[in-house]
A protein has these predicted regions:
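Conserved alpha/beta-hydrolase "acid-adjacent" motif
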Residues: 229-239
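Active-site glycine-rich loops that stabilize anionic/oxyanionic intermediates
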Residues: 16-20, 93, 226-227
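Alpha/beta-hydrolase-fold enzymes
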Residues: 99-186
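Alpha/beta-hydrolase fold nucleophile elbow
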Residues: 82-93
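Catalytic active-site module of serine/aspartate enzymes centered on a nucleophile-bearing elbow/loop
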Residues: 247-301
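Alpha/beta-hydrolase active-site loop
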Residues: 60-79
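Short beta-strand/loop motif that positions the catalytic acidic residue
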Residues: 222-224
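Conserved alpha/beta-hydrolase
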Residues: 29-54
Length: 301
């Protein structure tokens, strides 16, 4: 929990990405706290300080559904602890798909949403990968992975930046930040076959235009690196933004030039600073919208 001096103007709940942990958002949260914005985060199941393998991120049996419940309960506690303070939500990478799934189900009802490092892929492509991963799941140990699963997940992203210096070059071009990530004992190097399959399922559920029908009508920011393979080097993010616009959702789409996936740690080139600035500006948008009278007509807004 990161609190500003005095009463928070906004609470921003943060859901972190695959294989990492909530502590990696300290710089972002501290910067927002200087402007009266509180931040709160927790380690997702099988991540960070939670029990489980230290080499393979795995949420356990029914882990995705349990994680959605965790997110719902966490938001409820934040609302109880900070009554009257608008609640915004930020999801990065894995966290963005978890948040999107929650919103598709009408959960959380945030005052504003930030989806960072997200994207969309054709359902047919995801279905093929799912079928392959199901076969690999039978070969993998419980909570474990296989070489093919790694090749289909992180390996596919890393190949776009060959020749590779590390297993995670796709995350960012900032070598110092990348080395800190690889050396962080709370960051798992691999993803389990089971978690990858659950992620693929969530991507299919949240990718169709019908999925947007249940979303809360609140300000939305899509924020990604222009060179992020998860967002298909920007095209997948733009497609998602266009789909949201067609669904009548108030969305802003921002692609940071030269930045890869992990925009919050891409300090070299200034992408991380730009990301913090964009999020701060968007938080002001959330606050402005939340202060409007609820009985205002669309024309008056």
């Amino acid at each position: 929990l990161w609190l500003p001096d005095g009463q928070p103007r906004l609470m921003l709940q943060i859901s972190h990405g695959m294989t990492e942990h909530s502590g990696r958002y300290d710089t972002l949260a501290a910067a927002l706290a200087e402007h009266g914005i509180a931040c709160a985060a927790f380690d997702l199941r099988g991540h960070g300080r939670n029990p489980g393998s230290r080499t393979c991120a795995d949420m356990g049996p029914d882990g995705w559904e349990q994680s959605l419940s965790d997110l719902q309960r966490f938001c409820e506690r934040l609302r109880e602890s900070f009554p009257g303070v608008p609640l915004g939500m930020l999801g990065f990478s894995l966290g963005s798909f978890l948040l999107r799934d929650a919103l598709c189900r009408g959960m959380a009802a945030p005052a504003g949403v930030i989806l960072a490092g997200t994207g969309t892929q054709p359902g047919a492509v995801l279905a093929v990968i799912q079928a392959i991963v199901r076969g690999q799941l039978r070969r993998a140990k419980p909570g474990g992975t296989t070489p093919l699963v790694q090749k289909l997940s992180f390996g596919a992203y890393n190949r776009k930046f060959a020749p590779n210096r590390t297993r995670a070059d796709w995350l960012c071009a900032d070598k110092e930040a990348l080395d800190r990530y690889c050396a962080d004992p709370l960051c798992r190097p691999d993803i389990s076959a089971a978690l990858f399959l659950e992620l693929l399922s969530a991507m299919r559920r949240t990718g169709g235009k019908r999925a947007l029908a249940g979303w809360n009508r609140c300000p939305i920011l899509l924020l990604s690196g222009a060179d992020d393979p998860v967002g298909a080097m920007g095209s997948g993010v733009r497609q998602l933004g266009a789909a949201m616009e067609r669904a009548g959702l108030p969305v802003q789409t921002v692609l940071l030039p030269g930045a890869r996936h992990d925009i919050f740690h891409e300090e070299a080139g200034g992408a991380a600073a730009q990301a913090r600035s964009r999020i701060l500006c968007f938080c002001e948008t959330i606050l402005a919208e939340s202060e409007k009278p609820r009985n205002q007509s669309p024309a008056e807004k």
